[in-house]
From Swiss-Prot:
Heterodimer with other family members, including GBP1, GBP2 and GBP5. Dimerization regulates subcellular location. It is found in: Cytoplasm; Cytoplasm, Perinuclear region; Golgi apparatus membrane. Interferon (IFN)-inducible GTPase that plays important roles in innate immunity against a diverse range of bacterial, viral and protozoan pathogens. Hydrolyzes GTP very efficiently; GDP rather than GMP is the major reaction product. Following infection, recruited to the pathogen-containing vacuoles or vacuole-escaped bacteria and acts as a positive regulator of inflammasome assembly by promoting the release of inflammasome ligands from bacteria. Acts by promoting lysis of pathogen-containing vacuoles, releasing pathogens into the cytosol. Its EC number is 3.6.5.-. GO terms for biological process: cellular response to interleukin-1; cellular response to lipopolysaccharide; cellular response to tumor necrosis factor; cellular response to type II interferon; cytolysis in another organism; defense response to bacterium; defense response to virus; positive regulation of pyroptotic inflammatory response. Residues 482-595 form a coiled coil. This is Guanylate-binding protein 3.
Amino acid sequence: MAPEIHMTGPMCLIENTNGELVANPEALKILSAITQPVVVVAIVGLYRTGKSYLMNKLAGKNKGFSLGSTVKSHTKGIWMWCVPHPKKPEHTLVLLDTEGLGDVKKGDNQNDSWIFTLAVLLSSTLVYNSMGTINQQAMDQLYYVTELTHRIRSKSSPDENENEDSADFVSFFPDFVWTLRDFSLDLEADGQPLTPDEYLEYSLKLTQGTSQKDKNFNLPRLCIRKFFPKKKCFVFDLPIHRRKLAQLEKLQDEELDPEFVQQVADFCSYIFSNSKTKTLSGGIKVNGPRLESLVLTYINAISRGDLPCMENAVLALAQIENSAAVQKAIAHYDQQMGQKVQLPAETLQELLDLHRVSEREATEVYMKNSFKDVDHLFQKKLAAQLDKKRDDFCKQNQEASSDRCSALLQVIFSPLEEEVKAGIYSKPGGYCLFIQKLQDLEKKYYEEPRKGIQAEEILQTYLKSKESVTDAILQTDQILTEKEKEIEVECVKAESAQASAKMVEEMQIKYQQMMEEKEKSYQEHVKQLTEKMERERAQLLEEQEKTLTSKLQEQARVLKERCQGESTQLQNEIQKLQKTLKKKTKRYMSHKLKI
């Protein structure tokens, strides 16, 4: 977490006012400043079951989230507390305490369902807190989990049915932890001792039958098993005498039941060690700004009357981040070119080589910071901007070369121009002296470094502009015969034509270099895109295999339970038949003896 982020206490993240859920701008501002990956732990459960106490312990405090001391629910909406992660360096632990479910004063359960849904969508670990044992009443109170198929969509496709869509929930749902408060029973089943985890699995067993009562019994169990493949259970003794529960946050651990203190420590240790970084489809690790975006996307969807959609949330996040990734890549390119390029470059190839290195690095920056670039629109935008940057540099290089060469010509040839004006060469033999001086100055010009790509063109343009002066000196030179003058004129024309041909050749070379550079640029983008697509494909396959494995395990478990049920039923039928047969045999023997 950034050094300036220090939350001394929790803040409301999602306000619940008059049945309307609204994101708190101040809390979003805090999230936007957290650049580290986040581990998000959310707790849900009925009101007045002590959720806030556990969250305060995870924050390393006795006070923070409001505990309250009456049957009135204190927490409204969803509250957030961001603290440095105690076990994962460079990570931030985001704790979300939710409004108590089932408050009769709220009138209906609509808001409760949305609070539960948001807790599921935003967290990487979901803690469900309840009182006592896992009995049918506890399962009935967890009916919110059965509504998730009506509250969440994984894909944006309107033709996806609920069953197909909900099958993908496991790929992005959080781990599930059930905390049982004031647990007073012995952990056992059929006379055998159980661990809390075994107790949870035992409680999630399905009943055999097809009646409506059986379906109602199985539905919440099936949903928990289907949506949350990784499950954990913790039981907590009563911490202190009930009369003192109201002062729980004021009491020190020494004043509480030692067993309860140890149970809380075990719970916190598990959460710190096992809660994963919040991750989206495609292996995208969530940081503060990404969590902020998810909150806004889900809240806006609920406000519009739409279902929160994971795919849409990821795409909305991708739009923001890919746009920022383009700007980050361009900034890197500008920085690198600014440091490396000295205009004018001696050759076009020198400039293009520097561009290509900077372009490759910029593309790598984009690839590292982008995801879900549908149809590669943002990469195409980046490529277009980099092409324009290259063309701009080429233009600047050309202008810098022209300016440099023009300035050199002014310095080198101005003395000659002054001599021409003074008539020094308007005399017999003056033409030869002029040509010799001209050639000496050209040589001096060529020896000057870093003239750039316009060196020849600017020189030839200058010389062409002085042809009339050269011709005038030639015509006034009385030593030369008319024939010699004609030969000199032809030589000048030949040299001019040769220079023009050289300029055309240089232009063709520049054009060829530009075409080759564009092809190299295209191939580099394709190469990096292909590598990124391969990584994303591997990530997708891993996620799909994980989802498939989870489904197969659940299917095998259901079949096993069904077979066990059928086996038990068959065994009962066999025993019943044996008893019937025994009775008939006894009756037959009795009847036979009478005969």
